Amino acid sequence: MATLLVLHGPNLNLLGTREPDKYGATTLAEINQDLERRAREGGHHLLHLQSNAEYELIERIHAAKSEGVDFILINPAAFTHTSVALRDALLAVSIPFIEVHLSNVHKREPFRHHSYFSDVAVGVICGLGASGYRLALEAALEQLTGRA
């Protein structure tokens, strides 16, 4: 049994109502419920946190190490383009992670094209809406079982 942690960055608490043309109509609660169900069906444990505060995400990453978290799925949202601190926290705990974005950041404003995470992530999924989280979970479980 693996333990996975899903981290959602700033403004993702507004999913379903925030710019649905860019981010879709699925709520964060629906995404989390789907991931929890899929993990549970596979015999795994899934934790999640959404925060608009960078320090809360960093502290959660630090705690993940001592909790035995095996893999992290992270949508850093706006912190993607600004947070060296989150990047450093992920590197410090040495837990593999996949970066997820609902929208295709490469089709958006130029400042969104740069990520502080992509070069150290196992992989990046962007532009596939809420399905990206499901695909990231599947990929993480394949990585953990050696089927990747």
Swiss-Prot record:
Keyword hit for Lyase: yes
On subunit structure and binding partners, the annotation says: Homododecamer.
Q: Give the taxonomic lineage as stored in the record.
A: Bacteria, Pseudomonadati, Pseudomonadota, Gammaproteobacteria, Pseudomonadales
| Active-site positions on this chain | Y23, H101
Enzyme kind, highest EC tier: lyase
Q: Which family does it belong to?
A: Belongs to the type-II 3-dehydroquinase family.
Binding positions (substrate)? N75, H81, D88, L102, S103, R112
UniProt-listed Enzyme Commission number(s): 4.2.1.10
Spell out the protein name for this chain.
Answer: 3-dehydroquinate dehydratase
Matches recorded under PANTHER family = CATABOLIC 3-DEHYDROQUINASE
Show the disulfide pairing.
none
Q: Name one GO biological process term.
A: aromatic amino acid family biosynthetic process
